[in-house]
Amino acid sequence: MPSPEHPSWLSTLLADTRPPPKLFAWSPANLDSPTAVKPDRADRGDFDPGKYPVDAPITTASEPVKRIYIVGPGNVGRLYASYMSRQRDALPITLVVHRKELLSQWVTSEGVVLADRGGKVTKNKQFDVEWWTESRPRYGPVREVADGEKLHNVFISTKADAGLGEADRLRRYLGRCSSVVFAQNGVSKLWAPYGPLYVASRYHADDAPSFSACVVNHGISAAGLFYSIHTSPSDAFIGPIFKGSAAPAHGQNKRRRLDDDFFTTYISSTPFLDTKHVSSGQLWIIQLEKLVLNAAINPLTTLLRCKTGQLFASYDSHDALTRVLDQLLWQASAVIQALINHDANIDMLTSYAETVHRLVPGSDDYGRNFANIRRKLTVRFSQPILKAKLYAFGLNIREHRSSMLQDAEAGRKTEIRDVNGWIVDMAEYLGLDLDVGIHRGLIELIEECVVLDKEELARRLL
C-alpha cells in the first residue's frame, strides 16, 4: 500500500533527479523527405537544411505569450482545439503530437475534423503541429521548445497515466508565467497533500506554475486520424488545483492575478462547450462524482462491448447488470464518504465550504456549519444519489462509446488503473477495511481483455 508521504507515482517521478531535458520542437519542415512537405507560410521558405543557422530561433508562434499548446490532441484535445479556434480573436494553437510519423500524416490529412451527431462536419488545418523530443532534427530549422523560453498556456489531454509525467518532462519550460490545464479522466494526482510535495520538489518557491483541471462530460468518439465525432454534447468544468505561489515584483500584483486567470478564463469562454469556471473545492467534488460515473460506465461498456445506454436498459433489481451496478456504487460510495470525512482533505473541503456556502473563517458558527456541510456531502455521495446521477448521465450520452471501450477495441492500454484503481488505492490509504472487491475484479477483467455477457459478468464479480 502506498504511504501518504510517498505514493508510487511520486516516488517514480522524484527518483529521476536529472535536470529536465532540452526538447526540440520538430515540425513537418524537419521530416527526412523535404519534398513531402510544402511550406504553408512564406517565412518558412524551402526546407533545405543548409539554409538555417544551427539553433536559430525560427518561431512559428505569433504572440508567443498567448499561444496555446495542446499536448496530446486526441478526442478531447481535438474538441477544444476545434471550438477554441472559432472564438472571436482566437489565439494561435499548436498541436503537440507524441509520434514523429504524425507530422507527415498531418501534412496529408484534412486537419482537425469534427463532426456533430447531425452530420455537420467542420475541418480546420489552421494549426501548427509539433513533436517535442530530445532528438535534434537533421533537416530544416532547429528550434527548441518555446525557443528556449517559457510556455504560457498548456492544455494536456493525454491519457490520465501520462499527464503528470508529460508536465514533469516539460518543467524546463514551465514557470510562474505558466498555466497548465489537465483535461483527463480520473482524480488529479496534484491535490493536497501530494501536489504541494511534488511542486516543492520540482520548482523554486517563487517560480511554480499554476495547475488546473478540466472535467469534460461531452461524449466524443474517434472516427479516424485527427477526426472525432461529438456524439453527446454536454458540459465541462474547469478550476484550479494548485496556484503558483510566486511573489510578484513590486507593482505587478494586478498583472499577476490577470495572468493567473487568463488561460482558464479563455477556455471557459470557448463557444458551444459550456465550460463552467469553478473553485478548487467545487472542482474536487466534481472530479469525485465524475470518477464514480467513469468507474461504472467505462469498464462495463468495455467488457460488454456496448454503447453507454445499454447499461441502463433495466431498473429491475434482479437483473444481473443492475446487481453489478448496485454493488459497484455501494463500494465507491463508502470509499468517497470515508474520504470526505478524513482530515487529509481539509483544504479542499474548506475551499468548497467558503466558496459554495460562503462560510466565513473564524466566525462563531463556522465549526458547526462546516460539520453540517460535511454531512451534506456525505449524503451527496450516498449510493442512491450516485445511482440516480449515473442513470441520468448515462442515458444522456446513451449513444456514446466510452473512451475505455474505444481504447480496448484499438488495442491500446486503458485507464482502468486511474479510474477503478484510484478507488482501490484510496480504500487502502484510508485503512478502514473497505470492500472494493468489485473494482478489483473489474481491473483484472479489463487487463485480461475478456468480453462477457451480463450474466457471466455478474457471476465473475458478485
Curated annotation (Swiss-Prot):
GO molecular function, one term: calmodulin binding
Binding site for substrate: N294, N298, S403
Keyword field contains NADP: yes
Regulation of its function: Environmental stimuli such as light and salt stress suppress activity through stimulation of calmodulin (CaM) that binds BEA2 and probably impairs its dimerization.
Catalytic activity from the UniProt record: (R)-2-hydroxy-3-methylbutanoate + NADP(+) = 3-methyl-2-oxobutanoate + NADPH + H(+)
Temperature-dependent activity: Optimum temperature is 35 degrees Celsius.
Keywords per UniProt: Calmodulin-binding, NADP, Oxidoreductase
Pfam families for this protein: ApbA, ApbA_C
Disordered: annotated span: 34-55
Name the record gives this protein: Ketoisovalerate reductase
InterPro entries the record matches: 6-PGluconate_DH-like_C_sf, 6PGD_dom2, Ketopantoate_reductase, KPA_reductase, KPR_N
The protein's enzyme class: oxidoreductase
Span(s) of short sequence motif Calmoduling-binding: 167-184
Function: Ketoisovalerate reductase; part of the gene cluster that mediates the biosynthesis of beauvericin (BEA), a non-ribosomal cyclic hexadepsipeptide that shows antibiotic, antifungal, insecticidal, and cancer cell antiproliferative and antihaptotactic activity. Ketoisovalerate reductase BEA2 catalyzes the NADPH-specific reduction of ketoisovaleric acid to hydroxyisovalerate, a precursor for beauvericin biosynthesis.
Subunit text: Homodimer. Binds to calmodulin in a calcium-independent manner.
Mutant phenotype after disruption: Impairs the production of both beauvericin and bassianolide.
Gene3D superfamilies per the UniProt record, alphabetical: N-(1-d-carboxylethyl)-l-norvaline Dehydrogenase, domain 2, NAD(P)-binding Rossmann-like Domain
Record EC number: 1.2.7.-
Noted pH dependence of activity: Optimum pH is 7.5.
Residues of the active site: K290 (proton donor)
Bias kind Basic and acidic residues: ranges: 38-49
GO cellular component, one term: mitochondrion
